[in-house]
């Protein structure tokens, strides 16, 4: 029985950092990148927001393992330059 309880607690902890998506700025626009050179930049940007890693995908930074509080695309805000 203790194992079942520990399993559920562990699953809840993992779920906190399980959000994936395109990182957006405060103005609602995605973080831009260049596919051949942008992976290291995107990885740094995503990790700054507590993601597990990030990469450049379709000319925008895609993050894995973001906290639920970090806004991702599509954002409720529209992109305004």
Swiss-Prot record:
It is found in: Secreted. Expressed by the venom gland. Gene3D superfamilies: Knottin, scorpion toxin-like. Keywords: Disulfide bond, Ion channel impairing toxin, Neurotoxin, Secreted, Signal, Toxin, Voltage-gated sodium channel impairing toxin. Pfam families: Toxin_3. Residues 1-18 form the signal peptide. One of its GO terms (cellular component) is extracellular region. GO terms for molecular function: sodium channel inhibitor activity; toxin activity. The keyword Zinc-finger does not apply. One of its GO terms (biological process) is defense response. Has the structural arrangement of an alpha-helix connected to antiparallel beta-sheets by disulfide bonds (CS-alpha/beta). Belongs to the long (4 C-C) scorpion toxin superfamily. Sodium channel inhibitor family. Beta subfamily. This is Neurotoxin LmNaTx11.1.
